Amino acid sequence: MSKVYDWFEERLEIQAIADDITSKYVPPHVNIFYCLGGITLTCFLVQVATGFAMTFYYRPTVTEAFSSVQYIMTEANFGWLIRSVHRWSASMMVLMMILHVFRVYLTGGFKKPRELTWVTGVVLAVLTASFGVTGYSLPWDQIGYWAVKIVTGVPEAIPVIGSPLVELLRGSASVGQSTLTRFYSLHTFVLPLLTAVFMLMHFPMIRKQGISGPL
């Protein structure tokens, strides 16, 4: 086993990478509130795992979406647990994101030279809220349907571009299969991809600039 490790160490310098990760200086003022971002990341990873598991059973059609969710909850092995964890971690992710944003703002973590870190963090907060909006509709029950109808109808108040924007969100003039397909695609592909991209921007900047000092 040691020979295998030595082979990789010689080529990749694994120990140097491990030392860099584990030996980063942590300021003495850091407390549990500085862990909120990490908790948010953990919730996101739980969301990815449980959401991926549910895609094996969920059917994104207006006629089968609700029944497929019912199947997950009552028939699929541990389906009730997976979906429950998905819902709980979704709520936890939103809460932790809000608290994280407040913590960063109140401790001045958005100031120079961390402006870009703040901007990417705000984008991640918007993406988190978007996860909630799109995911809420996927069971396609009464609550989900009317939530989608209200949310997608909000832009209609915008002059000139309001109606075309509503039709773009819904996929047609009214809420239906096109709307569910769009929201499912956003929730399972577009938003996770964008979140991963902005996380890959956010974390290296934190790593490079370190944790902001006390007020």
UniProtKB/Swiss-Prot annotation:
Residues involved in heme b 2 binding: 86, 187
Alphabetized UniProt keyword annotations: Chloroplast, Electron transport, Heme, Iron, Membrane, Metal-binding, Photosynthesis, Plastid, Thylakoid, Transmembrane, Transmembrane helix, Transport
Signal sequence interval, chain numbering: none
Cofactor: heme b; heme c
Protein name: Cytochrome b6
Entry's family note: Belongs to the cytochrome b family. PetB subfamily.
Binding site for heme b 1: 100, 202
Classification via HAMAP family: Cytb6_f_cytb6 (MF_00633)
Further remarks about this protein from its record: Heme 1 (or BH or b566) is high-potential and absorbs at about 566 nm, and heme 2 (or BL or b562) is low-potential and absorbs at about 562 nm.
GO-annotated biological processes: photosynthesis; respiratory electron transport chain
Purpose: Component of the cytochrome b6-f complex, which mediates electron transfer between photosystem II (PSII) and photosystem I (PSI), cyclic electron flow around PSI, and state transitions.
Binding site for heme c: 35
UniProt subcellular location: Plastid, Chloroplast thylakoid membrane
Assembly description: The 4 large subunits of the cytochrome b6-f complex are cytochrome b6, subunit IV (17 kDa polypeptide, PetD), cytochrome f and the Rieske protein, while the 4 small subunits are PetG, PetL, PetM and PetN. The complex functions as a dimer.
Domain of life of the organism encoding this protein: Eukaryota
Record Pfam families: Cytochrome_B
CDD domains attached to this UniProt entry: Cytochrome_b_N
Entry note: cofactor: Binds 2 heme b groups non-covalently with two histidine residues as axial ligands.
Gene Ontology CC annotation, any one: membrane
Residues annotated as transmembrane: 32-52, 90-110, 116-136, 186-206
Protein topology in the membrane: Multi-pass membrane protein
GO-annotated molecular function: electron transporter, transferring electrons within cytochrome b6/f complex of photosystem II activity; metal ion binding; oxidoreductase activity
